[in-house]
Design a protein with these regions (language model features):
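Bacterial extracytoplasmic/cell-wall-associated proteins, especially those involved in peptidoglycan
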Residues: 45, 49-53, 57, 62-284
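Flexible glycine-/small-residue-rich
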Residues: 11, 36, 108
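Terminal hydrophobic membrane-targeting helix
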Residues: 1-31
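Primarily a LysM-type cell-wall glycan-binding module
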Residues: 30-50
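Short acidic, gly/pro-rich beta-turn/loop elements at beta-sheet edges
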Residues: 17-19, 42, 114
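Acidic helix-start/capping segments at beta-turn-to-alpha-helix junctions
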Residues: 1-2, 36-41, 78-79
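Short, structural beta-strand-to-alpha-helix junction motif
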Residues: 14-15, 39-40, 111
């Protein structure tokens, strides 16, 4: 029988899970929200520059706010988890990219490992729902490679927080175009050339971002993919890599007007920079 009480329902829960919780009563619960584009750790460089440099979207920060200690969090980051999600995850790699952005509900006695296991189970449902393993394979990518490219797309352009369906869909079409560029460059053994990867490398090292930072994560300096994802991709960026835009573009820029401009050749790309990217492109 259903017990009286207040239950907070997470979007990721199935009907059976909801009914089971209502039958057992809901109490001592906690709500934890993770974010698309979030990373496991806050930027060491930003944190060293000011007391307000902590990234409030980082997984560690969010888990701290939920009442867990740094030791509990660190141990959970190193723990082993049972999920088909990790079938092709390289041995020894971190959990970067797997803490799927969503709002989750937990009992008060849930451990950090319980929290992360629930998150991974939910992410695998997203993988299954969108048939990502097969769709990535059709692009010549493993699940881990697709996840890694999607994380770069996410940091280049996040779409999950767009306020209207129309704006979110327009943003998603840009994500598909960006995914097409990165996949094409990867297949041609070209450097991906993504600025967000050297920024991630600098954040991990605790140094000021520089385009020539010597790190395997810096795709402006090294060919191939970074060793791991650089953030948690949202569902839209995952779908963008699974179904990239048609075409053979090899370049893109974010213009000063907020639009994305694509090009097939270096000459076209330089023309786009001259026309549309005087401010933003001078920063790097």
């Amino acid at each position: 029988s259903i017990k009286a009480g207040t239950c907070m329902i997470a979007p990721s829960e199935s009907v059976a899970e909801i009914v089971n919780r209502m039958n057992n009563g809901c109490h001592d619960s906690k709500t934890i929200t993770f974010y698309p584009g979030g990373t496991l750790e806050s930027s060491k460089y930003k944190a060293s520059q000011s007391s307000s440099g902590v990234d409030k979207t980082s997984v560690r920060y969010i888990l701290r706010q939920a009442g867990y200690s740094d030791d509990e969090i660190s141990n959970a980051f190193k723990a082993k988890y049972d999920s088909p999600l990790f079938a092709d995850r390289p041995s020894g790699s971190s959990l970067e990219g797997y803490v799927f952005g969503e709002t989750y509900q937990f009992t008060g006695d849930a451990t950090v490992k319980d929290v992360l296991q629930t998150v991974f189970d939910h992410m695998y449902k997203v993988v299954q729902k969108n048939d990502l393993v097969n769709k990535f394979k059709a692009q010549g990518l493993t699940l881990y490679q697709g996840l890694t490219i999607a994380s770069i797309v996410e940091r280049e352009l996040g779409c999950e927080d767009k306020p209207t369906v129309e704006r979110k869909n327009r943003c998603y079409q840009y994500q598909r175009g960006i995914a097409q560029v990165f996949i094409a460059r990867y297949k041609k053994n070209m450097q991906l050339g993504s600025d967000v990867t050297f920024i991630y490398a600098a954040d991990k090292a605790g140094v000021k971002p520089k385009v020539d930072i010597d790190s395997p994560y810096n795709t402006r300096k090294h060919t191939g993919l970074p060793p791991t994802p650089i953030a948690t991709p949202g569902e839209l960026s995952l779908k963008a890599v699974a179904d990239p835009a048609p075409g053979d573009n090899l370049f893109f820029i974010a213009g000063d007007d907020g639009l994305i401009y694509f090009a097939k050749t270096d000459e076209e790309h330089k023309n786009n920079i001259d026309k549309y990217c005087q401010k933003l492109c001078s920063i790097v």
